[in-house]
Amino acid sequence: MARKASLTTEVVVAKATEIVKESGFNALSYRGLARALNVQPQTLYRYVANIEELQVQVILTFLDELIQYTQSQVIGFSGNQAILKFAQAVLTYSNHKLTLTSLLSTSADISDKREIKAKLMALRELPAVILKRQSSKQIDASGRVQMLMSLILGFAEYIDIGLYDGTEEQAVALLQSQIEKMLISN
């Protein structure tokens, strides 16, 4: 059990992240987090000002993990193959870590989204760099990145809410075929 003396903001955010991984954002509360850390709820205010700030920190933690994961999955690939690996990595992360639907819907309720937006733009930067290397037209690459991210995130949400009945492999194959069509048509 954690003690007040050993608490830090990092410890509080790590425990909150663990709770969200296990039970989702709806399970995250000051009272539950304090119980998990074996402290009084008011003790948490020293480390995180309010539940929204805590949610932001957890979202940023997940986005950092997603960015690192996607980067690791595209190493050694280029062009369309790297884009397909990126899409697969986002979908796999959403299926096994935290659904992007949960993350994005919680983000929608946050009053100050600047840090979250910056992380999402950092995530978007990976396919942007890949596509810019393929295209001499800046506008073309920008539009393709927007379409790609919309396709990936929309597809992840479609799966997350249970509207896709296939296996994960089938989902990845379907997403990849749609991305290939998009990349070929541009």
Predicted regions and their residues:
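Amphipathic alpha-helical packing segments from all-alpha helical-bundle domains
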Residues: 110-136, 142-146, 173-180
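Amphipathic C-terminal alpha-helical segment
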Residues: 96, 149-167, 181-186
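HTH DNA-binding helix-turn interface
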Residues: 22-25, 45-56
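Hydrophobic alpha-helical connector segments
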Residues: 57, 71-97, 145-148
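Basic, helix-initiating cap at the start of DNA-binding domains
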Residues: 1-23, 53
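Alpha-helical DNA-contacting segments of helix-turn-helix folds
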Residues: 54-62, 104, 112-120
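Append "Primarily bacterial transcriptional regulators
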Residues: 32-35, 44
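Amphipathic alpha-helical segments used for helix-helix packing
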Residues: 91-113, 157-165
